[in-house]
């Protein structure tokens, strides 16, 4: 599967790209996981992918490395709905890999994506999902949650922003795990689904969804 995004590539659209074999992005591609704006978290594998792409590699390379700085980056990108201003920045944020291509002229991305698909098809085998994802556990989650409280005390985040961000922190760190460990991708995917369904039951999430549909702007409640 080769994805060929251009322009706004947000939420589920980005999650399609994250799980493609290759992405061929236009230079002016604006990527972001912005689900918190409607009171939800990325639950199409987006939260899991941020842990897999931003946290797992440095911990594989140096197991004794403190995970918090890498988790902080993944957490902030989701909880603050950060959006890349270009495909180059999307690569810096982990939305694109070094193997993904950036095509500066958007008129050429379909032909470039077709070439990539044909190249990949020669001898293609589906990717294996044997690799595990680093889950930092409860202690590191507590540090992220303290950051959430600090944002609330400074009036940079509402009470419900904190609820949503808490779900993000829980998924990224592996849920109720007491100790850091490597877990299957499915572990984080189940946590994503659980958080998404829990938030979908909340009235304030409904208010955020309705506001975006009616006004085109996110509601802070």
How would you name each of these model-derived features?
Residues 11, 44, 84:
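Glycine-rich phosphate-binding loop at the start of an alpha helix
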Residues 1-38:
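Glycine-rich beta-to-alpha active-site loop
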Residues 32-34, 45-48, 52, 94:
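Catalytic binding pocket for nucleotide-activated donors in carbohydrate/polymer assembly enzymes
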Residues 41:
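Conserved P-loop NTPase nucleotide-binding/switch module
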């Amino acid at each position: 599967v080769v994805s060929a995004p251009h322009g706004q590539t947000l939420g589920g659209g980005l999650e399609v790209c994250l799980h493609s074999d290759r992405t061929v992005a236009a230079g002016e591609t604006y990527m972001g996981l912005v689900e918190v704006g409607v009171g939800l978290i990325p639950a199409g594998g987006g939260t899991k992918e941020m842990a897999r792409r931003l946290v797992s590699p440095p911990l594989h390379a140096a197991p004794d490395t403190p995970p918090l700085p890498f988790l902080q980056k993944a957490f902030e990108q989701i909880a603050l709905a950060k959006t890349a201003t270009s495909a180059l920045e999307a690569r810096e944020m982990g939305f694109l890999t070094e193997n993904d291509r950036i095509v500066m002229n958007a008129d050429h991305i379909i032909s470039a994506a077709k070439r990539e698909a044909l190249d990949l098809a020669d001898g293609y085998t589906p990717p294996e999902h044997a690799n595990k994802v680093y889950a930092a556990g409860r202690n590191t989650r507590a540090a992220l949650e303290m950051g959430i409280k600090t944002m609330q005390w400074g009036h940079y985040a509402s009470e419900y922003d904190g609820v949503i961000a808490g779900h993000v922190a829980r998924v990224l760190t592996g849920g109720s795990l007491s100790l850091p460990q490597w877990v299957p991708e499915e572990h984080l995917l189940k946590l994503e689904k659980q958080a998404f369904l829990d938030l979908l039951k909340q009235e304030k999430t409904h208010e955020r969804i309705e506001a975006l549909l009616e006004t085109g702007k996110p509601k802070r409640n």
